[in-house]
Swiss-Prot record:
A lipid is attached at C555, C562, C565 (S-palmitoyl cysteine). Belongs to the influenza viruses hemagglutinin family. This is Hemagglutinin. One of its GO terms (biological process) is viral budding from plasma membrane.
Length: 566
């Protein structure tokens, strides 16, 4: 009779109403790394490393780049005849120059402080070309005979369009004294040069005077150059060389030129009408008729991600370059569906006791599952889910905002005398990239650890919220579930979910059921103890009889000798 009562109580207990706290799970296979674990499968994750580009040169914020094609910056500014398409250019967002453009200094020579000039262009977005000394204003010198086969145009000898190579006239080269006052409101970029002949014969043939100079002065510049006559190997068919110079003439300042030979005079200058962040980018790509906020030499990036690994040289509002191959930020929970439980991580299952997630709960990250006489079902806790979503979204957006940098570094150029500085600069830049990469990877690992811990804490908080309401009206099953000692219909379940559960209303029913179950357990324990003692005694007696019978049989057939000594 007692066994029947116990069985009935156990069956009744198994059918008691229950409410469980759990979390969302899905079919996601996305994995993230944390400080302590690798390849943790999560329900949701966000890739924050951009790896793709469009392979094109694009306008930057609606402004086209100045793509110099086969011309160099020097060829463009001096006016190489093969660069006539760039005689007048509109505003640019950045300048594109090939690695080794063929149309540079057609007449061989050097461009003094060329790298500094390029640096100036990285802060300039528009030039306006103006004439400062007309070509026909040199009555005592030949202004049209200064041409060379090294700078051909339509099969004939020509010269740079924006400067004038002055030659002697009527076997005389009178000393030049010419000034220009900058009456503009903008700074002026002025270029000039000096010719270094191959020998003395060429010197007198072109300039008559055997000893010459070129002197240039402004309020900040005082320069005097003397031609260097020397025998040199031919380049572009020329043994002579030309050296070009530049300066910035401020408004109201005056530039003075004085020379008695070898002078390459400016005809045009460049008014700097718009300054701003620009750059000279080395690339062989063509314009792709597109628009972007971030450009690299190998293509444009259109991404809101905070990091990229496409190219270290960029211009615009770009993600931060890192050397990483993978940066994935966890936004969801550990993905451990109940049907396929996985190995516990460092901190065990979520909240320490809930072993599996619910794929049936699709409208929230955390929630409840109940079962009673009216049925069963899932219900998400939308308040805690929304708070978690807002917190993680704000965190991701904060990371993106902090990492987005405007007009990121573009490669610097150094002349031949600065190679050691260039090498040091590369070492420093590589070091900075290594540090940024390490910081980015560490940031992701730490944030992923915090996110997963954050979700676990939210589940635990939801569990504690239910536990504190139910008190002793239900018992904890140890798997995230509570078993009621009273009937709990759907209205009762809803009151628990919204935090309005009326403990006193159900406490008496719960107490009676709890005491009844406890009494049955105690009675069943007494029965089990009697049965246990009876079983032990009976087993021992049977074993003793078996041993005695075996001994008697062995003595009777002589297999065992029995002696009784008194």
């Amino acid at each position: 009779m007692e066994e029947i009562v116990l069985l009935f109580a156990i069956v009744s207990l198994a059918r008691s109403d229950q409410i469980c706290i759990g979390y969302h799970a899905n079919n996601s296979t996305k994995q993230v790394d944390t400080i302590m674990e690798k390849n943790v499968t999560v329900t949701h994750a966000q890739d924050i490393l951009e790896k793709t580009h469009n392979g094109k040169l694009c306008s930057l914020n609606g402004v086209k780049p100045l793509i110099l094609r086969d011309c160099s910056v020097a060829g463009w500014l001096l006016g190489n005849p093969m660069c006539d398409e760039f005689l007048n250019v509109p505003e640019w967002s950045y300048i594109v120059e090939k690695d080794n453009p063929v149309n540079g200094l057609c007449y061989p020579g050097d461009f003094n402080d060329y790298e500094e000039l390029k640096h100036l262009l990285s802060c300039t977005k528009h030039f306006e070309k103006i004439r400062i000394i007309p070509r026909d204003s040199w009555p005592n010198h030949e202004a049209s005979l200064g041409v060379s086969s090294a700078c051909p145009y339509n099969g004939r000898s020509s010269f740079f369009r924006n400067v004038v190579w002055l030659i002697k006239k009527d076997n005389a080269y009178p000393t030049i004294k010419r000034s220009y006052n900058n009456t503009n409101k903008e700074d002026l970029l002025i270029l000039w040069g000096i010719h270094h002949p191959n020998d003395a014969a060429e010197q007198t043939k072109l300039y008559q005077n055997p000893t010459t100079y070129v002197s240039v002065g402004t309020s900040t510049l005082n320069q005097r150059s003397i031609p260097k006559i020397a025998t040199r190997p031919k380049l572009n068919g020329q043994s002579g060389r030309m050296e070009f110079f530049w300066t910035i003439l401020k408004p109201s300042d005056t530039i003075n030129f004085e020379s008695n030979g070898n002078f390459i005079a400016p005809e045009y200058a460049y008014k700097i009408v718009k300054k701003g962040d620009s750059a000279i980018m080395k690339s062989g790509l063509e314009y792709g008729n597109c628009n972007t906020k971030c450009q690299t030499p190998i293509g444009a990036i259109n991404s809101s991600m905070p990091f990229h690994n496409i190219h270290p040289l960029t211009i615009g509002e770009c993600p931060k370059y890192v050397k990483s191959d993978r940066l994935v930020l966890a936004t969801g929970l550990r993905n451990t569906p109940q049907r396929k439980r996985k190995k516990r991580g460092l901190f065990g299952a979520i909240a320490g006791f809930i072993e599996g997630g619910w794929q049936g709960m699709v409208d929230g990250w955390y929630g409840y599952h109940h079962s009673n006489e009216q049925g069963s079902g899932y219900a998400a806790d939308k308040e805690s889910t929304q708070k978690a979503i807002d917190g993680i979204t704000n965190k991701v957006n904060s990371i993106i905002d902090k990492m987005n940098t405007q007009f990121e570094a573009v490669g610097k150029e150094f002349n031949n005398l600065e190679r050691r500085i260039e090498n040091l600069n590369k070492i420093l830049e590589d070091g900075f990239l290594d540090v940024w990469t390490y910081n980015a990877e560490l940031l992701v690992l730490m944030e992923n650890e915090r996110t997963l811990d954050f979700h676990e804490a939210n589940v635990k908080s939801l569990y504690d919220k239910v536990r504190l309401q139910l008190k002793d009206n239900a018992r904890e099953l140890g798997n995230g579930c509570f078993e009621f000692y009273h009937k709990c219909d759907n209205e009762c379940m809803e009151s628990i979910r919204n935090g309005t559960y009326n403990y006193p209303q159900y406490s008496e029913e719960a107490r009676l059921n709890r005491e009844e179950i406890s009494g049955i357990k105690l009675e069943s324990m007494g029965i089990y103890q009697i049965l246990s003692i009876y079983s032990t005694v009976a087993s021992s007696l049977a074993l003793a009889i078996m041993i005695a019978g075996l001994s008697f049989w062995m003595c009777s057939n002589g297999s065992l000798q029995c002696r009784i000594c008194i």
